[in-house]
Amino acid sequence: MPTQTPPLALRVAEIPPFHVMQVVAEAAALEAKGMDVIHLEVGEPDFSTPSDVLAAAQDAMASGHTRYTDARGLPALRDAISAWYASQGLAISAERIQITQGASGALLLAAAATVNPGEQVLMADPAYPCNPRFVEAVGGAVHWLRTEATDAFQPSAAMLRRSACAEDHVLMLAHPANPTGMAVPAAELRAMVSWCQDTGRHLIVDEIYQPLSFEGELQSSLHLGQDHFVVGSFSKYFNMTGWRLGWLVMPEYAVSACQKLAQHLFICAPTTAQHAALACFRPDVLAEADARKEILKSRRDFLIPRLRALGFDIPMMPDGAFYVFADASALTENSQAFCVDLIRKTGVALTPGNDFSQALPPTWIRIAFTETEARLDEALRRIEDYLAC
């Protein structure tokens, strides 16, 4: 007799598709046929993990460091992160640092600690598409804040005072943000930290791109207050995307709760990755990371004028990360169709902007400057030829 398949949870059906996956699938199919694909769709630079980090991982495995760690993370790694913050003028106790399975693990942990079923999280549109999923996974909902290019696609304290309601218990910021690369302006960040404190709301700030700032040192939100959550990661600045390692700085009031959640949700972050990450804070590795940041800045400065010349509207230079968020309305009415047709005809992979925004018109595109300048130049040449047809 046929068996009846039980229904899956409603949350699965409610998750919107990753539109870029159509581009990724097209790219894979083309590469399988031998086409040279230029990948400007994935948030992962072409840099490899630093050699000192690789050596530390090999040493850890050879020494048998493959078992569980404390759920909070290796004490030495938490101390190293604390010292890294101290080098920025911040006193962050290692007791307030939780090692996580990537920044995603940190965001999920922060959401689980702060959001009750039915409560809302204030979040800017556009946003990284996984962030609302963390909120929904713990039974919350997102209260979207529509932002504009003139506001650096970031919310403001005035917007919060105007839009927040009783159901909004958390504000989540990204500093700088994906897909825009724009940081929260300093005055607005200070005002929003104060607003959360004054109104009794939690604040979660995703700072995984904060070390990758191009216009001087971008200060952490922790300089403005210590009573909120900050997410960090080894993925972007230290080029450890596949190692799945991040951290969460917790306010004192949430340390015990987050540790309890981490014990039950994750057991621990990957042990070998933790031992490897200890090498990230050596002076030579930090110097290498900063040198790579300068390379990314050079790529940004090379790419944006050329994109503008092709007809892409880029309202402002990104402050950090490695993304350009461009309005292609002069070139297309549908960025999804544009990106799919572009990859098929040229082998240049870009990300349609509808993955990031419910409010913006469907003409925006995210372009990652994660390839060499020579490859970026080739991508631009192909796009120019495509537009000329």
Task: List the predicted regions and their residue ranges.
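PLP-dependent enzyme catalytic core of the Aspartate aminotransferase-like
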Residues: 83, 91, 332, 341-350, ...
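Conserved PLP-anchoring active-site segment centered on the Schiff-base-forming lysine
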Residues: 113-135
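Short acidic capping loops at alpha-helix termini that bridge into adjacent secondary structure
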Residues: 92-97, 117-120, 226-227
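A short helix->loop->beta-strand "cap" motif at the edges of active sites that frequently abuts
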Residues: 119, 140, 198-202, 226
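Conserved core segment of the aminotransferase class I/II
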Residues: 226-294, 304-306, 386-387
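N-terminal small-domain helix-loop-helix segment of the aminotransferase-like
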Residues: 2-102, 109, 280-283, 387-389
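Conserved glycine-rich beta-strand-loop-beta hairpin in the small C-terminal domain of fold type I
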Residues: 278, 294-304, 315-328
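Active-site phosphate-binding strand-loop segment of PLP-dependent enzymes
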Residues: 148-216
